[in-house]
A protein has these predicted regions:
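Small-molecule kinase domains that catalyze NTP-dependent phosphoryl transfer to phosphate-bearing small molecules
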Residues: 106, 135-136, 156, 160-205
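Residue-level signal for inorganic ion chemistry
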Residues: 25, 44, 94, 122, ...
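Well-ordered beta-strand positions
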Residues: 39, 45, 139, 183-184
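ATP-dependent NMP and nucleoside kinases share a basic, alpha-helical "lid"
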Residues: 107-157
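ATP-dependent small-molecule kinase phosphotransfer cores
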Residues: 45-119
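An amphipathic alpha-helix signature
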Residues: 36, 58-62, 147-152, 162, ...
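Short, Lys/Arg-enriched N-terminal segments with co-localized hydrophobic residues
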Residues: 1-11
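Walker A (P-loop) phosphate-binding motif
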Residues: 11-45
């Protein structure tokens, strides 16, 4: 159990922010935590949950972007995508709507796991530093590869050319910068087994596994 100085030395949950760069293998590490019974709050899941049929998020999107982005009561992602990716101002509007709702969803999920007294709660957030989430976690773990490995894995995963892959990588904060801000770094340049060993060793060292 994590002992925190912010609560008079009382035992409480450690909130670990998990992030990385595009195609560096964050999902692999996230799944390893889940396989070991560690609760993971996944921001990508939250992004889908907050715009489900009947949600406040879907209503807000309809008010701002119109009926054309709704199909049979569901979000028409293709129609919305066409609007926001052709107009940066529209994308900014969408990010403002979703950002607040996703933050609220993450907070509620995190608090639920804390109330259940889990010693470790992982917040899996792709743009953790870019969105300022380092302020709400106790520690940050970055899953990293070299830029060359990242580039080739992204090209292979998304079946895209090198120029497109470089543009996607350039849209995020460089992985090397994230590593400098991390409390823990998982080196994902090697095999999945090598990554698994690093995660298991970390869990044991932090006394979350015995």
């Amino acid at each position: 159990m994590y002992v925190s100085s912010r609560d008079g030395g009382a035992a409480m949950s450690l909130i670990l922010g998990l992030t990385g760069g595009i195609a560096t293998g964050k999902s692999t590490v996230s799944n390893l935590f889940k396989e070991n019974g560690i609760p993971v709050v996944d921001a990508d899941v939250g992004a889908r949950e907050v715009v489900k049929a009947g949600t406040e998020g879907l209503k807000r999107i309809e008010v701002v972007f119109g009926h054309q982005v709704i199909s049979s009561g569901q979000l028409d992602r293709k129609a919305l995508g066409k609007i926001v990716f052709e107009n940066p101002k529209e994308l900014e509007k969408l990010n403002r709507i979703l950002g607040d709702l996703i933050a609220e969803w993450i907070h509620d999920e995190k608090e639920r796991y804390i109330e259940e007294k889990h010693p470790l709660v992982v917040l899996d957030i792709p743009l953790l530093f870019e969105s300022g989430y380092q302020e709400v976690v106790d520690r940050v773990m970055v899953v990293a590869t070299t830029p060359d490995v990242q580039l080739h894995r992204l090209m292979e995963r998304d079946q895209i050319d090198e120029q497109t892959a470089r543009q996607k990588i350039a849209a995020q904060e460089p992985i090397m910068d994230k590593m400098l801000k991390a409390d823990f770094v998982i080196d994902n340049n090697g095999t999945k087994e090598n990554t698994r060993i690093q995660v298991m060793n970390w869990l044991k060292k932090q006394q979350f596994l015995h």
